[in-house]
UniProtKB/Swiss-Prot annotation:
Organism phylogeny: Eukaryota, Metazoa, Ecdysozoa, Arthropoda, Hexapoda
Location of the protein in the cell: Mitochondrion
Protein family: Belongs to the EF-Ts family.
Role summary: Associates with the EF-Tu.GDP complex and induces the exchange of GDP to GTP. It remains bound to the aminoacyl-tRNA.EF-Tu.GTP complex up to the GTP hydrolysis stage on the ribosome.
Record's protein name: Elongation factor Ts, mitochondrial
Amino acid sequence: MMLTRLTRLVTGTNTAPSLHCRWYAAATAEKSALATLRKKTGYTFANCKKALEMHGNDLAKAEQWLKEQAQTLGWSKATKLEGRNTSQGLVGVLVRDNIGAMVEVNCETDFVARNQSFQSFVQAASAACVRYVAQLETDANLTKHGLNSEALKQIKLEDGKSLGDHLALMIGTVGENASLNRAICYRAPAEVKLTGYVHPAPADDSTPDVPAFGKYGSLLAFRHTAVAEDSNGEAVARKVCQHVVGMKPTRLGDKARDEPAADKDDETCLIYQEYLADPSYTVGEVLEANQLEVVDFQRFECGEKVKAEEENVRATN
């Protein structure tokens, strides 16, 4: 009998180790599912664990339950936090073909502005605005659509839910108040091009179809004045878009009506400002040298105060 026990210990023929292995494998699978769910949703350890336990470790069902709970809690939290100051946030910019959108989304702290859930929402809002404008009736002119907070909340995303619903969901995730502040969207005819810029600029600028975000943003509508388009024209236009962010012009300016400011540091007309990339030239001189004309531009600074009438505009070229 002693020999039999020793043999079992050496060869592992006892049933206890086998049960232990099965328990260990199950525990490992649960940990893996928990880690996957947390990474995918960003919700707390406790909530993810509860969701998996309720749905037999079914990831899809657990994720759906978490989203439904977060939506309910998000609207509740959004109501409780409503009215709290949201002076921080991000500006999202997306140019896709002949449509450009710039959206400002605000939050309470810079800490949340760096949160992935918040940044993803800014990108989703930018893309939603582009899709929304694509569905509107248009004409042969450059159109400029201003959207206020309430109008933005009504825009539907591809999943059928509104931006307002997704805002509440995000508020429930980040735990502080947030708001859809405003948006400006352009839709350009064939002869007009669009470009955009955000500051700080993203490290990887090789994916133009992905919405960019920063503390400042600008959109620029431009066209070539020559029949043959200069291949460098779009690069110059983007530099001018960057100039708009840095130098804060308030209007385009017209040589026939406007005179340069007496003090160049006080200049607010875009065409008379010293070019940010090379102050030895004015923006107007750079545009003329590259056979470009700026049709319109818009600049957002996160947290700035603007007049309500500026958010509802329509421009023609």
